[in-house]
Swiss-Prot record:
The gene is ileS. Its EC number is 6.1.1.5. It comes from Saccharolobus solfataricus (strain ATCC 35092 / DSM 1617 / JCM 11322 / P2). It is found in: Cytoplasm. CDD domains: Anticodon_Ia_Ile_ABEc, IleRS_core. GO terms for biological process: isoleucyl-tRNA aminoacylation. InterPro entries: aa-tRNA-synth_Ia (IPR002300), Anticodon_Ile_ABEc (IPR033709), Ile-tRNA-ligase (IPR002301), Ile-tRNA_ligase (IPR050081), M/V/L/I-tRNA-synth_anticd-bd (IPR013155), Rossmann-like_a/b/a_fold (IPR014729), tRNAsynth_Ia_anticodon-bd (IPR009080), Val/Leu/Ile-tRNA-synth_edit (IPR009008). Catalyzes the attachment of isoleucine to tRNA(Ile). As IleRS can inadvertently accommodate and process structurally similar amino acids such as valine, to avoid such errors it has two additional distinct tRNA(Ile)-dependent editing activities. One activity is designated as 'pretransfer' editing and involves the hydrolysis of activated Val-AMP. The other activity is designated 'posttransfer' editing and involves deacylation of mischarged Val-tRNA(Ile). The lineage of its organism: Archaea, Thermoproteota, Thermoprotei, Sulfolobales, Sulfolobaceae. A motif ('KMSKS' region) lies at residues 534-538. Pfam families: Anticodon_1 (PF08264), DUF5915 (PF19302), tRNA-synt_1 (PF00133). Disulfide bonds: none annotated. The keyword Protein biosynthesis applies. This is Isoleucine--tRNA ligase. Its main location: cytoplasm. Belongs to the class-I aminoacyl-tRNA synthetase family. IleS type 2 subfamily.
Length: 986
């Protein structure tokens, strides 16, 4: 919806918008879902039971079906994009274009094959990149201490700790830090080598109290010591590794936060183990296959799943008396982000793109991008600083095939950059569908020896697909289109995509174009439940958008979401949706009011222009016009940085607070006047002008209700509000001084309401006079400019505006001794000081206010009294009520005259009659006849105000006596009974 709002906004600005939607259709999630549909559970079954061709077709069918469902969901909430022309990453043209990135990486010397220890999913039988290892579970694993016997010594052992017993069969060497202090520790007649600083913790964990440190020494003394592998007789392959079983220095890789300070190292199952092993020339030992099972070389453990093998390994260690201690540990362990299987580390051959070569360029390009909010830049920069080479190959089926062919004769590597290039060198016909298994059958002629080259079986990391969208989505001739459209103006996704899509786009852009492919990145938050938890069906807190749409409609959902600060998570709230519904009702009613009165007066907006009528506008009309243009200006500034939430709040708050709750209340009486005066025409035109432009802009947020309002409200409307263009703000009509004056007026109104409440004076009762005292000349001038508006707002006969000094005639000072402070300071003298203050209040107050202090002579002592000792407050004189606002004070009389009370009563009666008109669903032009039964003492009052009542209620006649009509109601007004009947005049 955020994307949709931004695209709609750019359209109403008159811009040509590239709004092609797209779907990532490859990858493990679709493979796993397809496996479930086919009733299979592993990779081998795809090959043996289903067949790769059938499986690929089913994956494609599943992906396209889900894409269609997503399209309908997007359309349902008003997402307006080019749905007839989406891109799919499975399209042959997309795959063909994407190959150009891999070809470019090869040409730059960034693509090669290498061995590395990587996370591997034994269920999915594929590797995972670092950024794919993002999901963890709390798992319970063994926590064991194992004794490695030192060769040539009778009872001396290296003590190691591990939580992965299954890696011990692949052990090659032991790592230490030569600069640490180590100790020979005697336990039960055996000598254990442990880092000195870990002895106490290890013995405590093993519940051993009877031990003795025989000596301590530097780790350098251990370097080169050889040991016997504890499982040598169970794993025959270990007999070939005897020469490598020794202690080596690994520096700070070895820590003293846990373990023993000696680290068992399996070069095939640990990244640091692999790195250190390479440094010392040790072999890469890995006895585990793609399914996570021990191979033939695993000896006794052949065929066992590695995690299952741990139990057997521990049992064998016990039998050989090499298990020192066995415990359990619950720790955060990485699982496959798709199937949730615990991952393992394996040393495997993979294809890499050496992106570390362009790390500095990436960081430079990040600086050039507009990141919204700013913290997006620091997060992605920190990630790039820790960048590692990209493992691009995956051992799966449903993905973009890697365009790498290797000659069977000379091992020459050939990388293809497009389908067209492949066709030019292919020995076999190139299929239209570039997926496996069809692409696997295409051989090419080696450009080095003329031999036959075959494609490697791997597919690309699924993030490769999304990372090339900026150009691959443009089709076959993407180079020409990119010249016209590139770079991408905006990329928008959730904050999780900083390490996902945003990064993969950046990476591909640097490889292909030597620059970031985008100029701005906007990050959005996620939907949480009311407690701030992530929504999951498994937690029972997930709310389907369709349920919200069914209950409240699309626009309410859109408005509520778009109001939330874009990059912050939003807490779902039914109450917030209900409040949003009320706001939409206010918006609707605002247009109903405008339409009704304009239609009644046959107002024709196309006969006028703003420049023509502006000279007839009243001060409140100029104010709303200024507020509108100021709002447009703010929207314009906010949307330069795509701050959708700011635009949404500016638009909605303007219509509700400025137009509906303020301006319309000010102009309602003018709209009721029969004659079409020039100022009334000006009022109508300005209201029409701002509402028309408002609904055009609002269509970017609430398109459904905007479409309905637009077609019924706008004269000579186009086919759709989406075909309209928005105007820019006009500086000529922005009057900041006037806006500030009205802000003060609103404060004055609030202060007046507060004063009325204190005095118990109803709002409908007019005030004879309101006194307004202003603190500074500038504000005084502003308020003076809108005196007539204030009279109407305050329901006053007159107002008097003057400087703050004038308030003195309505105030007096209340002076009280601060007894606690005086008592602490003056002890025994305090009663006399308090008495003095109470007897000299006025002079003390004047001195402190004017001179900051008053000097009192008490018992021949000069006592200096200031604001710490004397509490001075200002009170309003008897008969009046005051209320403060930020720029001054409002004063009203507590007393209401008989005439004012009468007018208040009449207004209460009018309000009841207008309510009854609504109950009869009368048109605003319809006349009525009124009959009333009122208290006898009120008859003369009604007769006195008869013409006023008739004009305000559109009544042709008022009869006092028995109440009758089309509707009759009994009203209690100020404790008196008024029975009122009305009927439509014939």
């Amino acid at each position: 919806m955020i994307k949709d709002c931004i695209l709609r906004y750019q359209r109403v600005l008159g811009k040509r918008v590239h709004d092609q939607p797209g779907y990532d259709t490859h990858g493990l999630p679709i493979e796993v879902a397809t496996e479930k549909l086919l009733g299979i559970s592993n990779k081998q079954e795809i090959i043996d039971k289903i067949g790769v061709e059938t499986f690929i077709n089913k994956c494609k069918e599943f992906a396209l079906s889900n894409a269609d469902k997503m399209t309908q969901n997007f359309k349902n909430v008003g997402v307006f994009m080019d749905w007839e022309r989406p891109y799919y990453t499975l399209d042959p043209s997309y795959i063909s274009s994407s190959w150009s990135v891999i070809k470019k990486a090869y040409e730059k010397g960034m693509l090669d094959k290498g061995t590395a220890v990587l996370h591997w999913c034994p269920r999915c039988e594929t590797t995972l990149s670092d950024y794919e290892v993002s999901e963890y579970r709390d798992l319970e694993d063994p926590s064991i201490y194992v004794k490695f016997k030192i060769k040539g010594e009778k009872n001396r052992y290296l003590l190691i700790w591990t939580t992965t017993p299954w890696t011990i069969p692949s052990n090659v060497f032991v790592m230490i830090n030569k600069d640490y202090d180590y100790a020979d520790v005697e336990v039960n007649g055996e000598i254990l080598v442990i880092a000195k600083d870990r002895v106490e913790a290890v013995m405590k964990e093993a519940s051993i109290t009877n031990y003795k440190i025989l000596r301590t020494y530097k780790g350098s003394e251990l370097i080169g010591i050889k040991y016997e592998h504890p499982l040598r007789e169970f794993v025959s392959a270990q007999t070939k590794l005897d020469d490598f079983h020794q202690v080596v220095d690994a520096g700070n890789i070895v820590t003293l936060t846990d373990g023993t300070g000696l680290v068992h190292s399996a070069t095939g199952h640990g990244e640091e183990d692999f790195t250190v092993g390479q440094k010392y020339g040790f072999p890469v030992v890995m006895f585990v296959n793609d399914r996570g099972e021990f191979t033939e070389e695993g000896g006794k453990y052949k065929g066992l799943k590695v995690r299952d093998a741990s139990k057997a390994i521990i049992s064998d260690l016990k039998s050989k008396n090499t298990l020192f201690f066995e415990g359990k540990i619950v720790h955060r362990y990485p699982v496959c982000w798709r199937c949730k299987t615990p991952l393992i580390l394996r040393a495997i051959d993979q294809w890499f793109i050496r992106v570390t070569k362009i790390k500095d360029k990436m960081l430079n390009e990040i600086e050039k991008v507009n990141w919204i909010p700013d913290w997006g830049k620091s997060r992605i920069s920190n990630m790039v600083k820790e960048l590692r080479d990209w493992v691009i190959s995956r051992q799966r089926f449903w993905g973009t095939p890697l365009p790498i062919w290797i000659c069977e004769r000379c091992n020459n590597v050939m990388v293809v950059g497009s389908k067209e290039e492949l066709e030019s060198i292919a020995i076999d016909p190139v299929p239209n569908d570039l997926h496996r298994p069809w692409i696997d059958n295409v051989r090419v002629k080696c450009n080095k020896c003329g031999g036959v080259a075959k494609r490697i079986p791997d597919v690309a990391d699924v993030w490769f697909d999304s990372g090339v969208a900026f150009f691959a989505s443009l089709g076959k001739d993407w180079q020409e289109k990119w010249k016209e459209l590139g770079p991408v103006d905006l990329v928008l996704e959730g904050h999780d995509q900083l390490r996902g899509w945003f990064f993969s786009l950046l990476r591909s852009g640097l490889i292909l174009l030597d620059r970031a492919p985008y100029t701005s990145v906007l990050v959005h938050g996620f939907m949480l439940d009311e407690q701030g938890r992530e929504m999951h069906k498994s937690l029972g807190n997930y709310v389907e958008p369709s349920v919200v749409v069914e209950k409240y409609g699309r626009d309410i959902l859109r408005l509520w979401l778009l109001r939330n600060t874009t990059w912050e998570d939003a807490k779902f709230s039914w109450k917030a949706l209900e409040l949003t519904k009320r706001d939409l009702q206010i918006i609707w009613n605002t247009f109903v009011f405008a339409s009704m009165y304009m239609n009644l007066d046959n107002f024709e907006p196309d006969k006028y222009t703003l420049d023509d009528i502006i000279k007839y506008a009243k001060i409140e009309d100029l104010w709303i016009l200024s507020r509108f243009n100021s709002m447009l200006k703010k929207v314009n500034e906010s949307m330069k940085d795509y701050k959708v939430h700011e635009m949404t709040n500016y638009l909605i708050n303007f219509l509700i607070e400025d137009v509906s709750r303020f301006y319309i209340r000010l102009i309602r009486k003018r709209a009721w006047i029969e004659a079409n005066t020039q100022d009334k025409i000006a009022m109508y035109y300005i209201l029409y002008y701002i509402l028309k432009q408002w609904i055009i802009l609002a269509s970017t947020i609430i398109p459904f209700i905007s479409e309905k309002i637009y077609k019924s409200f706008v004269v000579n409307a186009k086919e759709s509000v989406s075909m309209e263009s928005s105007i820019n703000y006009d500086e000529r009509f922005i009057d900041n001084e006037l806006e500030r004056a009205f802000e003060v007026a609103r404060e004055i109104n609030e202060a007046s309401l507060n004063a009325r409440a204190k005095a118990g004076i109803k709002l409908r009762w007019p005030l004879a006079k309101v006194y307004i005292f202003i603190e500074n000349e500038d504000t005084l001038a502003k308020v003076g400019r809108i005196k007539d508006v204030l009279i109407s707002m305050l329901n006053a006969k007159d107002i008097e505006i003057s400087k703050i000094e004038g308030f003195k005639s309505f105030s007096k000072y209340k002076v009280e001794p601060n007894r606690s402070i005086i008592g602490k300071e003056y002890k025994s003298m305090s009663p006399k000081i308090v008495e003095y203050i109470e007897n000299n209040r006025d002079i003390i107050a004047m001195d402190i206010l004017n001179k900051k202090q008053h000097v009192a002579k008490i018992d021949n002592f000069d006592i200096i009294l200031n604001a710490s000792y004397v509490i001075i407050s200002e009170e309003t004189v008897e008969g009046f009520i005051s209320s403060k606002f930020s720029k001054g004070i409002v004063v009203i009389s507590k007393e209401i005259s008989e005439s004012e009370e009468e007018e208040g009563l009449i207004r209460d009666i009018i309000r009841r009659i207008q309510f009854m008109r609504k109950q009869l669903k009368l048109n605003v032009l319809d006349y009525i006849e009124i009959s009333m039964k009122v208290p006898e003492e009120r008859v003369k009052t009604i007769q006195k105000w008869e013409e006023f009542i008739k004009s305000e209620t559109r009544a042709s006649n008022i009869i006092l006596g028995e109440a009758k009509g089309d509707i009759t109601m009994d009203w209690d007004i100020e404790g008196e009974s008024y029975i009122i009947g009305i009927k439509k005049s014939t």
